[in-house]
């Protein structure tokens, strides 16, 4: 036992947050600090300074003046700085601002309706007992009550709500347990936030009818107030009696009406006290956390103000000494600034008191200083203070004091200061802050770190430890009579000799260090190990020896980045003298993602028996064979072993007796006991053993004695084709794979056929090692790996060797000739590709083709250019395939298996076929970011090519090969591709790291409980069964039908290892089997029925005819005919029995057995899919058994029970931290996704967001406006639908003016008149494309375009020109005018603040980039963010410059269309979108007006509607052009009209279906392998598609916008969309993530019934404040927790870590109780 003082006897149960009151702080403070200098000239702390010794010693030399203890024992004491004037509390300043804004300064009441107040109080009260539903019920009661009674009084409302509330509170059974749950927390914070947002806006007071006063905050340090112009005084003010001692709060003076002034903290305080008097009963609920500790006292409004500042003890702001210089701590500097201000203010106040010039509210503050007024005051300090009069000086320094106080709390609050010292917020937040650096991650002892190097002779579960570490790392081992001998020897050896000891801990906890030089001391200690200590209080327990690590001790190894569970595993130590590095077996490299180019790893030595037990049993390498991401194996042998193994097991590899024995011995060096051997395969002329027999010998010796050896049929990685040298003779029914070397057959532990390669001992599924793991467990599979590694190494070392030569890469001469010919052909394919891409006629000349190519390259829309790229790639791909066919594999000089390079590639050792092709055939097409190398503006790809050259070489098609060398330009392309890979690697790490952190912080608490549900740490159920079937991913690998034969083949072993007989004797599957039978019976009966019929339905169908015949007369009642009523009556009159007959026939299908019977308790309760798999397999098995010659020993029933047992054994264990596993399984693969695998869309394809950007969109932002929204709907396969869908596609496609405009001609001239009459004249002629050009694609006619020009485009043009001018003038003269009365006009001002608020809200919702602020991303992010912010600022400046009417109109536009605003970056884009409402329907056909009169009228209309249009003409015949003359007043600034018109033309939308930009028809194959058409749209508008139900199969409509799906189809649909979207992102990169992880993440995100992101806005609903604070924006969450008075139950993992509790997960989920008897 450890000494008693280390034994914990108390545990934290919870933490609550609150604030100290002023009185308590005054009592806690030991000293008032008044001296701004903190050290004197000698560097000693000065009295009353910030390092006064009363606050505790600042370093080890001093003694505390308060408690007279030294630095180690005194924990420090608080002091305080008195402030001469009240200041705002920066912590609560924003709430104070809202309170003042939402209350009336005249009658001191809140301006929100009384109903809202009483409703909120009632809602918060019912939430205190966790009654969630009552919240919505209260809303309903209130709205009904308000409808019924016209204008109820506050008292009536209160009565009505109180009646319901009290009922709820009385019936409450849960007590306060229900309140710390996610849903309740979410609801509470939502209600309060909603209240602040809606009811705290400035509006007219409903009580005293005073106009609204506008409050603005500036720089977080002062409040500017604009008083209302009218004040209504009540005539009867006597009604409100004031209690004694409360000064009557000032109202609003006559003088102040309509003025604007500075609201001092003291007047704000008076006003707040007055509000509190009136509204305190309610505000106490809003600020429940700010109560003083006593239960009676309610919230204290003085919390919003500070009269003094608390000074933390000196030891928490130590002085940093560097040489003989002293550097002060940042906190001290901030406090010093406050003190300097306080001194100045005191002087100023004394001076003003003398001159009697104090402003009215200050008089009582300075009465006490009156007595010394006679003393003359030094006035020299006044020069330091800004401001003309003394009062101004006072106000200015007061504001300065306020901003210095702010800095103490948060240095970001003062935006103007340049050199910033960290405030309290900076100490807590970010990665370097207290929470994340010191509470969540702590440094540890008993750890080691060194470089790793490989070693294939140790076991896979071992780690080689150098002697340096072995003598430093120790383990505290209690001395007992059993181990005393060993420990004595260790003590005698001492700290430097291994195995020794470094220290002995005595019974009372004192430590004796063992001397390295004094052997006598060590012997003395060694002799007394078992003698009990003497002394008065007999200490209990035994001595403990800290002994060195020895062989077989367990160590935890870890390599950063620790991205998933296998990055930390437990290894057994093997001490290797003479080493300085850690030695790691090759097989573990993949798990750690380690290579040996200088990687370092950390080792940790667990210090308790519990920790060791967990490491040996759970974290051991043998148990980590499968990765939790998708259950694939991680450990596997590496390159040389593959080559060696494949060569060794090939037919025709023989060994003599000596060689056989040598190899077997090398493989089984550490086997204890006899080695079983095989008889030789060849007896004459002398005995020889095959390589396969060597492997078999190993296997039967490794498999545990009491288990049957394994049976396995599998495939090798080397395919059967590779072994075939020439064409085989035709044989009927010949299967080329059977008995071939690519088919691996193991029977009873003997390898009979096939080659062993990567597929069997690499990290690949269902190989030999995986099967051993499955049947015999991790220990055996680990030994198989170890022994095979030794064997294959020995084979290479002793007998074989492995090398590559030039001969392996040479190509036969005739193949070379073919290759040369194909390369020559390929140079001619360029023009063909461009023609195909741009669909040009065959006869087109080269110049014409080049011209078109140039147009495509330089045009803004890159689709055509991408198309050319794609066609080129297709062409050259064809050629590279031809070349490869000619040279590989038959064109090579040497063939497999003699060809060592091919052997290496085929067996999976290293390299790929691509590598061999690049060596022997050609390099192929070089690609950058998924496309050919880009062209320069001149049209060349590199300077050495012609512009727009047709040869594929110029586009990066390298026909050279490494064998014969490549040319400089080709080499350059090759290097470009190599560089791209490096860039990606560097950029993607920070992105994916932050993504993973977000997911982990959210899901960390999800753990499987003992009832198999997945719950969050507060007990809220996220899934009833993990992954919806409760299975553990690594255990499910062999539950696939393909692996059933393997399980059947090894029935004996599995039955024994899984204890089948014991299970069957205890578990009775009858209940479940009966249930399954019932389900099958129901399905059998109702197989044909699509619709379920109810009992009454079948009854009415039966008697319908009879009732009709009665011809009943009568009227329809409630929409029911007399016949229906008659039938109802007859149904009610039926007797029980006959009605039961009908009901029985209509009984619903019973629930699946999994949902009725808990799978861990009831045997054979499996999921429906698995049940179906078992059924199918048993039928196959039975059919096979009938066909086969010998009868199988395995009966069908036994096979079924075996599979059911395997399923039950695969259930996930309680305590498994599935949330973390899911987070790691998404985060870890995301680091492998290269950032820039973009998908460049050609003309016929959709743009899709891929990779990490898409993952961030789904998981971290849950954004409502995604970058590439799309819908896809299959088209019905009927003639009618297929015909109509073409026109539908046309109708849904958006048309921009730029797409139908051929060219614009612009002529510019000047018209010079008198002074003011100078004009610029532009003549614009728009020429449109002929109708034939776009007839197929677009749903438009020329006259529609003309109409659009006249009605919309000219207006847009006018607005754009106006904007250009305003921008220009704004830049030219920076407006520096004084604020005029108009600015102060309250209507406009409030409008501004309203908008400002809205913008703030916007910013809240729109995380520009959460992590850039969080310090979690790289520098480039921060730069980019600053840039974004700069741009935002610019926009806001321009808005102000516009004329008001235009602004109003803009507002109108913007509000018009909600869907698009989110991601249109520039205001100008909205102008085009305005059209959207008008053009929902296809454009109306304007009949062309005939006759000169009509034409004139039309021209006149255009000229009249636009002031700046001088003249207008249009094509009256064809509507193919129009010409307009624009006359503008001459300005100093010139702008480019043509670029303006072009950019507008691209933005202006002639016709659109709201939300949809483009439509495509693609052909795909569906699940039944039938071809079908699918309509894909870019953009989303679900209701629009619902109109075409006869063309589109709406039941299979899909969209990638999760919010749209949730709003249309409900949250369960959104859940499936999230799963599918994440799966699709990974699928692009070929990464498989188990669907159970995805379903858990999706379930968590939709837990509250809405789709919430995994970022700091999503964590707001968490019930653990500590979890929120350790995530992001700690200060914000701390503030919230303090104000709400939150309580943390310390259940979430983060909270447990912060306070040092064991996390409630894994082995921490349960407690062990000792039986005391």
From Swiss-Prot:
Phosphorylated. GO terms for cellular component: chromatin; chromosome; mitochondrion; nucleoplasm; nucleus; RNA polymerase I complex. Residues 475-549 are annotated as: Involved in RRN3 binding to Pol I complex. The modification Phosphoserine is found at residue 1393. The record marks 561, 805 as: NTP recognition and base pairing. Residues 1380-1397, 1452-1464 have a biased composition (Basic and acidic residues). Mg(2+) 2 binds at residues 595, 597. GO terms for biological process: negative regulation of protein localization to nucleolus; transcription by RNA polymerase I. Pfam families: RNA_pol_Rpb1_1 (PF04997), RNA_pol_Rpb1_2 (PF00623), RNA_pol_Rpb1_3 (PF04983), RNA_pol_Rpb1_4 (PF05000), RNA_pol_Rpb1_5 (PF04998). It comes from the Eukaryota. Catalytic core component of RNA polymerase I (Pol I), a DNA-dependent RNA polymerase which synthesizes ribosomal RNA precursors using the four ribonucleoside triphosphates as substrates. Transcribes 47S pre-rRNAs from multicopy rRNA gene clusters, giving rise to 5.8S, 18S and 28S ribosomal RNAs. Pol I-mediated transcription cycle proceeds through transcription initiation, transcription elongation and transcription termination stages. This is DNA-directed RNA polymerase I subunit RPA1. It comes from Mus musculus.
């Amino acid at each position: 036992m450890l000494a008693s003082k280390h034994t914990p006897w108390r545990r934290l149960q919870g933490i609550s947050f609150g604030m100290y009151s002023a009185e308590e702080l005054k009592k806690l403070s030991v000293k008032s600090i008044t001296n701004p200098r903190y050290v004197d000239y000698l560097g000693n702390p000065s009295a009353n300074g910030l390092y006064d010794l009363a606050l505790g010693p600042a370093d080890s030399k001093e003694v505390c003046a308060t408690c007279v203890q030294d630095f180690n024992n005194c924990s420090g004491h608080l002091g305080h700085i008195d402030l001469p004037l009240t200041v705002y509390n920066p912590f609560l300043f924003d709430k104070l601002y809202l309170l003042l804004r939402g209350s009336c300064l005249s009658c001191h009441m809140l301006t929100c309706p009384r109903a809202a107040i009483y409703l909120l109080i009632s809602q918060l009260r019912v939430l205190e007992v966790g009654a969630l539903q009552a919240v919505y019920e209260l809303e309903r009661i209130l709205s009904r009550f308000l409808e019924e009674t016209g204008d109820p009084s506050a008292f009536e409302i209160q009565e009505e709500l109180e009646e319901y509330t009290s009922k709820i509170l009385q019936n409450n059974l849960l007590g306060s347990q229900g309140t710390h749950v996610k849903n309740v927390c979410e609801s509470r914070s939502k209600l309060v936030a909603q209240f602040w947002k809606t009811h705290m806006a400035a509006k007219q007071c409903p009580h005293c009818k005073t106009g609204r006063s506008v409050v603005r905050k500036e720089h977080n340090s002062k409040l500017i107030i604009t008083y209302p112009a009218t004040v209504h005084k009540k005539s009867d003010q006597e009604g409100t009696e004031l209690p004694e001692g409360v000064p009557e709060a000032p109202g609003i003076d006559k003088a102040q009406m309509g003025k604007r002034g500075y609201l001092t903290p003291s007047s704000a305080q008076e006003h707040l006290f007055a509000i509190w008097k009136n509204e305190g009963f309610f505000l106490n609920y809003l600020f429940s956390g700010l109560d003083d500790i006593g239960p009676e006292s309610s919230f204290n409004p003085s919390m919003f103000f500070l009269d003094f500042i608390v000074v933390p003890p000196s030891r928490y702001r130590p002085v940093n000494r560097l040489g003989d210089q002293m550097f002060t701590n940042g906190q001290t500097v901030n406090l010093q600034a406050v003190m300097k201000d306080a001194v100045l203010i005191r002087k100023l106040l004394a001076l003003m008191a003398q001159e009697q010039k104090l402003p009215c509210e200050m008089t009582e503050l300075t009465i006490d200083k009156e007595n010394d007024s006679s003393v003359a005051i030094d006035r020299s300090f006044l020069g330091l203070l800004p401001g003309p009069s003394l009062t101004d000086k006072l106000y200015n320094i007061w504001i300065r004091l306020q901003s210095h106080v702010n800095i103490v709390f948060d240095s970001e609050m003062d935006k103007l200061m340049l050199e910033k010292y960290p405030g309290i917020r900076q100490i807590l937040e970010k990665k370097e802050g207290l929470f994340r650096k010191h509470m969540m991650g702590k440094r540890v002892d008993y750890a080691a770190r060194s470089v790793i190097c490989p070693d294939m002779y140790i076991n896979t579960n071992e780690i080689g430890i150098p002697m340096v570490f072995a003598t430093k790392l120790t383990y505290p081992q209690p001395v007992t009579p059993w181990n005393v001998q060993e420990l004595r020897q260790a003590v005698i050896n001492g700290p430097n000799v291994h195995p020794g000891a470094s220290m002995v801990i005595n019974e009372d906890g004192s430590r004796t260090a063992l001397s390295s030089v004094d052997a006598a001391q060590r012997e003395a200690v060694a002799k007394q190990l078992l003698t009990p200590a003497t002394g008065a209080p007999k200490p209990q327990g035994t001595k403990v020896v800290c002994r060195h690590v020895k062989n077989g001790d367990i160590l935890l190894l870890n390599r950063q980045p620790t991205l998933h569970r296998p990055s930390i595993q437990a290894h057994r130590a093997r001490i290797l003298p003479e080493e300085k590095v850690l030695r790691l077996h090759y097989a573990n490299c993949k798990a750690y993602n380690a290579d040996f180019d200088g990687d370092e790893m950390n080792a940790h030595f667990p210090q308790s028996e519990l920790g060791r037990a967990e490491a040996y049993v759970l974290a051991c390498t043998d148990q980590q064979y499968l990765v939790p991401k998708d259950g694939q194996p991680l450990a596997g042998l590496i390159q040389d072993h593959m080559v060696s193994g494949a060569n060794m097991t090939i037919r025709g590899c023989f060994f003599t007796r000596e060689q056989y024995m040598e190899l077997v011995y090398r493989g089984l060096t550490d086997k204890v006991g006899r080695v079983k051997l095989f008889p030789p395969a060849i007896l004459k002329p002398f005995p020889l053993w095959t390589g396969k027999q060597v492997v078999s010998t190993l296997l039967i010796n490794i498999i545990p004695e009491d288990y049957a050896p394994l049976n396995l049929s599998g495939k090798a990685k080397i395919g059967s084709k590779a072994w075939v040298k020439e064409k085989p003779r035709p044989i009927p029914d010949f299967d080329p794979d059977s008995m071939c070397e690519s088919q691996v057959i193991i029977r009873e532990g003997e390898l009979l056929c096939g080659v062993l390669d990567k597929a069997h001992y690499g990290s690949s599924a269902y190989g030999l090692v995986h099967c051993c793991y499955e049947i015999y467990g991790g220990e055996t599979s680990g030994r198989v790996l170890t022994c095979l590694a030794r064997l294959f190494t020995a084979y290479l070392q002793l007998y074989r060797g492995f090398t590559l030569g030039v001969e392996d890469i040479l190509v036969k001469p005739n193949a070379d000739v073919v290759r040369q010919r194909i390369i020559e052909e390929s140079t001619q394919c360029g023009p063909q590709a461009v023609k195909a891409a741009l669909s040009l006629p065959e006869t087109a000349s080269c110049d014409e083709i080049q011209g078109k190519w140039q147009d495509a390259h330089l045009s803004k829309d890159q689709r055509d250019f991408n198309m050319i790229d794609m066609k080129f790639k297709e062409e050259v791909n064809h050629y590279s395939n031809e070349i490869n066919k000619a040279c590989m594999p038959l064109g090579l000089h040497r063939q497999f298996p003699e060809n060592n390079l091919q052997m290496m590639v085929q067996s999976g050792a290293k390299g790929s076929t691509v590598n061999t092709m690049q060596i022997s055939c050609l390099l192929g097409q070089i690609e950058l970011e998924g496309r050919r190398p880009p062209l320069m503006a001149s049209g060349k790809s590199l300077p050495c090519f012609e512009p727009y050259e047709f040869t594929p070489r110029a586009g990066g098609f390298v026909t050279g090969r490494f064998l014969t060398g490549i040319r400089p330009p080709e080499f350059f392309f090759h290097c470009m591709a190599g560089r791209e890979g490096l860039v990606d690697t560097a950029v993607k790490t920070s992105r994916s790291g932050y993504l993973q952190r977000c997911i982990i912080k959210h899901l960390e608490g999800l753990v499987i409980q003992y009832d198999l549900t997945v719950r969050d740490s507060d007990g809220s159920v996220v899934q009833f069964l993990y992954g919806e079937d409760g299975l553990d991913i690594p255990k499910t690998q062999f539950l696939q039908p393909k692996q059933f034969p393997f399980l059947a083949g090894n029935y004996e072993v599995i039955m024994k290892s899984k204890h089948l007989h014991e299970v069957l004797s205890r578990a009775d599957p009858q209940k479940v089997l009966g249930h399954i039978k019932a389900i099958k019976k129901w399905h059998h009966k109702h197989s044909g029925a699509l619709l379920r019929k109810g009992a009454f339905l079948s009854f009415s169908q039966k008697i319908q005819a009879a009732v009709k015949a009665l011809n009943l007369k009568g009227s329809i009642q409630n929409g029911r005919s007399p016949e229906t009523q008659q039938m109802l009556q007859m149904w009610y009159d039926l007797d029980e029995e006959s009605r039961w007959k009908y009901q029985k026939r209509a009984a619903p299908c019973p629930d699946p057995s999994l949902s009725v019977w808990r799978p861990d308790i009831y045997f054979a309760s499996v999921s429906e899919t698995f049940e179906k798999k078992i059924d199918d397999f048993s039928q196959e098995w039975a059919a096979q058994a009938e066909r086969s010659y010998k009868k199988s020993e395995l009966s069908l029933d036994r096979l079924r029970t075996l599979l059911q047992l395997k399923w039950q054994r695969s259930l996930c264990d309680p305590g498994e931290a599935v949330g973390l596993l899911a987070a790691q399984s998404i985060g870890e693969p995301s680091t492998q996704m290269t950032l820039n695998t973009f998908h460049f869309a050609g003309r016929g394809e959709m743009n899709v967001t891929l990779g990490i950007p898409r993952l961030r969109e789904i998981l971290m932002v849950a954004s409502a406006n995604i970058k590439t929204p799309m819908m896809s709907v299959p088209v019905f396969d009927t003639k009618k639908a297929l015909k109509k869908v073409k026109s539908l596609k046309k109708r849904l496609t958006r048309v921009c003016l730029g797409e139908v405009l051929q060219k614009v001609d612009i002529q510019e001239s000047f018209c010079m008149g008198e002074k003011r009459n100078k004009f610029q004249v532009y003549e614009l002629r728009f020429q449109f494309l002929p109708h034939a050009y776009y007839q197929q694609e677009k749903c438009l006619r020329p006259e529609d375009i003309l109409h659009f020009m006249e009605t919309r485009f000219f207006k847009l043009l006018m607005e754009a020109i106006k904007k250009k001018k305003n921008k220009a003038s704004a830049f030219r003269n920076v407006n520096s005018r004084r604020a005029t009365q108009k600015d102060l006009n309250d209507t406009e001002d409030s409008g501004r603040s309203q908008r400002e608020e809205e913008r703030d809200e916007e910013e809240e919702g729109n995380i520009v980039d959460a992590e850039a602020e969080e310090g979690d991303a790289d520098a480039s992010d921060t730069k980019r963010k600053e840039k974004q912010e700069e741009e935002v600022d610019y926009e806001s400046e321009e808005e102000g410059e516009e004329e008001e009417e235009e602004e109003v109109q803009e507002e109108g536009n913007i509000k018009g269309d909600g869907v698009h605003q989110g991601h249109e970056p520039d205001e100008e884009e909205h102008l085009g979108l305005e059209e959207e409402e008008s053009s929902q329907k296809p454009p109306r056909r304007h009949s062309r007006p005939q006759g000169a009169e009509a034409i004139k009228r039309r021209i006149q209309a255009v000229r009249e509607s636009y002031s700046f249009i001088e003249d207008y003409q249009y094509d009256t015949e064809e509507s193919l052009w129009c010409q307009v003359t624009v006359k503008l007043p001459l300005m100093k600034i010139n702008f480019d009209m043509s670029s303006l018109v072009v950019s507008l033309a691209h933005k202006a939308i002639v016709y659109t279906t709201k939300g949809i930009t483009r439509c495509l028809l693609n052909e795909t194959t569906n699940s039944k392998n039938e071809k079908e058409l699918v309509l894909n749209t870019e953009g989303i508008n679900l209701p629009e598609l619902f109109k075409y139900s006869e063309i589109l199969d709406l039941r299979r409509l899909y969209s990638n916008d999760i919010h749209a799906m949730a709003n249309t189809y409900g949250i369960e649909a959104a859940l499936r969309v999230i799963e599918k979207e994440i799966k699709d992102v990974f699928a692009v990169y070929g990464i498989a993530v188990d669907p159970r992880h995805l379903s858990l993440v999706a379930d968590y995100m939709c837990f509250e019934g809405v789709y919430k992101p995994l970022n700091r806005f999503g964590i707001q609903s968490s019930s653990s404040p500590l979890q929120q604070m350790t995530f992001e924006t700690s200060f914000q969450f701390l503030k919230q927790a303090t104000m709400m008075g939150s309580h943390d139950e310390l259940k979430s993992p983060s909270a447990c870590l912060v306070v040092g509790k064991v996390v409630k997960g894994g082995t921490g989920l349960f407690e062990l109780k000792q039986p005391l008897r």
